[in-house]
From Swiss-Prot:
Protein role: Cysteine desulfurases mobilize the sulfur from L-cysteine to yield L-alanine, an essential step in sulfur metabolism for biosynthesis of a variety of sulfur-containing biomolecules. Component of the suf operon, which is activated and required under specific conditions such as oxidative stress and iron limitation. Acts as a potent selenocysteine lyase in vitro, that mobilizes selenium from L-selenocysteine. Selenocysteine lyase activity is however unsure in vivo.
Organism: Serratia proteamaculans (strain 568)
Protein name: Cysteine desulfurase
Reaction equations catalysed: (sulfur carrier)-H + L-cysteine = (sulfur carrier)-SH + L-alanine; L-selenocysteine + AH2 = hydrogenselenide + L-alanine + A + H(+)
UniProt EC number: 2.8.1.7, 4.4.1.16
Active site: 364
Metabolic or biological pathway: Cofactor biosynthesis; iron-sulfur cluster biosynthesis
GO biological process, one term: cysteine metabolic process
Gene name per UniProt: sufS
Length: 406
């Protein structure tokens, strides 16, 4: 059965708008995806009919909201095949999830002289927290270098590991190159050497089925807004045995058992230990609806459609003279490119005049820009609602820019 692209597009209301008198071609979902009506309706319905502060409320609305919040936790656990809903921590997004691990796991388990491995393709969110921790704790940060095609050489990993190495933190899918790292194989190598593994899944969960138990990772993080859900909500999965040993990283309400000015404070069990303060309950409802949406379409069907579109786009872009595409042939979600000597900002600005939305800049990956010796790149990203017609418009727009600017 063919992918129901026309129906899918009709379910995303923002796709109907025009930009600069042109139909919008939204090719920036890797930055943030648009939302289906089902997600918008669920969040609105919660505010209209079900909103209340969760935890400890004895009245009906509070009890219902708490039950719905925990139901979303169960839904997320099933979505990534966690062993238990108690391994699912609600956070603001991928960035906060990684910072939580750095500040809790890192400060508790890592000692001066220990080392952490990251890769050269990481988003700043999976670089800067480790740099901050390394500076504070006297750790060593080791970088797994890229190959020219934007992939990792797995044969290089053993040379980065010694007795001091405690953690590997890497992305599953590069937010710039679309490189799909073989994270299951990488995790197996790292775990065999005694490392803990954190996987940044921000660019993966919307394109492919994720099974954290099969991956055997210790931590997995992703954001809701890239998964067609609301902004301000994300997920940190943590292996339960590790979470039990980790101290809280923020203090406040909801994350305690008892507070005493004389006897001190005792903390709640995970995951609530890591969820201080009033949570983004409406965002949780929207995230649950987003998971329902992609599950209904089927991640396998979504992945097949997107891969077909990606192959079409890569072939079509060959028609543009002096266009340089970065990264491997096999990729997910994104195409990073530059057009001759033209600055990415200028290319993006021209495309916007034609109603085509792409992302330009360093994409929060300055070390990757340095690897390719460029200050910036253009990035077009493909999602389940994009079409071949939009790819054709991108190609035509780039050809037009080439004629105008030379």
């Amino acid at each position: 059965m063919s992918f129901p692209i026309e129906r899918v597009r009709s379910e995303f209301p923002l796709l109907a708008r025009e930009v600069n008198g042109q139909p919008l071609a939204y090719l920036d979902s890797a930055a943030s995806a648009q939302k289906p009506q089902a997600v918008i309706d669920r969040e609105l319905d919660f505010y209209r009919h079900g909103y209340a502060a969760v935890h400890r409320g004895i009245h009906t609305l509070s009890a219902e909201a708490t039950q719905e919040m925990e139901a979303v936790r169960e839904k997320v656990a099933a979505f990534i095949n966690a062993g238990s809903a108690e391994e699912i921590i609600f956070v603001k997004g991928t960035t906060e999830g990684i910072n939580l691990v750095a500040n809790s796991f890192g400060r508790h388990f890592l000692q001066p002289g220990d080392s952490i491995i990251i890769t050269e393709m990481e988003h700043h969110a999976n670089i800067v927290p480790w740099q901050m921790l390394a500076q504070e704790r006297g750790l060593n940060l080791r970088v797994w270098p890229l190959q020219p095609d934007g992939t990792l050489d797995l044969a290089r990993l053993p040379g980065l590991i010694d007795a001091s190495t405690k953690l590997l933190a890497l992305t599953q899918v590069s937010n710039v190159l679309g490189t799909v790292n073989p994270v299951q194989e990488i995790t197996a190598q790292a775990k065999a050497a005694g490392l803990k593994v954190l996987i940044d899944g921000a660019q993966a969960v919307m394109h492919q089925r994720v099974d954290v138990q099969a991956l055997d990772c210790d931590f997995y993080v992703f954001s809701g807004h890239k998964l067609y859900g609301p902004s301000g909500i994300g997920i940190l999965y943590g292996r339960q045995a590790l979470l039990q040993q980790m101290p809280p990283w923020e203090g406040g309400g909801s994350m305690i058992q008892q507070v005493s000015l004389t006897a001190g404070t005792t903390y709640a069990e995970p995951p609530w230990r890591f969820e201080a303060g009033s949570p983004n309950t409406a965002g949780m409802m929207g995230l649950g609806a987003a998971i329902d949406y992609v599950n209904t379409l089927g991640l396998e069907a979504i992945g097949d459609y997107e891969q077909s579109l990606m192959h079409y786009a890569l072939e079509a872009l060959q028609q543009v003279p002096r266009l340089k595409i970065y990264g491997p042939a096999e990729r997910a979600g994104v195409i990073a490119f530059n057009l001759g000597e033209h600055h990415a900002y200028d290319v993006g600005s021209f495309l916007d005049q034609y109603g085509i939305a792409i992302r330009t800049g360093h994409h929060c990956a300055m070390p990757l820009m340095a690897f390719y010796n460029v200050p910036s790149m253009c990035r077009a990203s493909l999602a389940l609602y994009n079409t071949r017609d939009e790819v054709d418009r991108l190609v035509a727009g780039l050809q037009r820019i080439q004629k105008l600017l030379g």
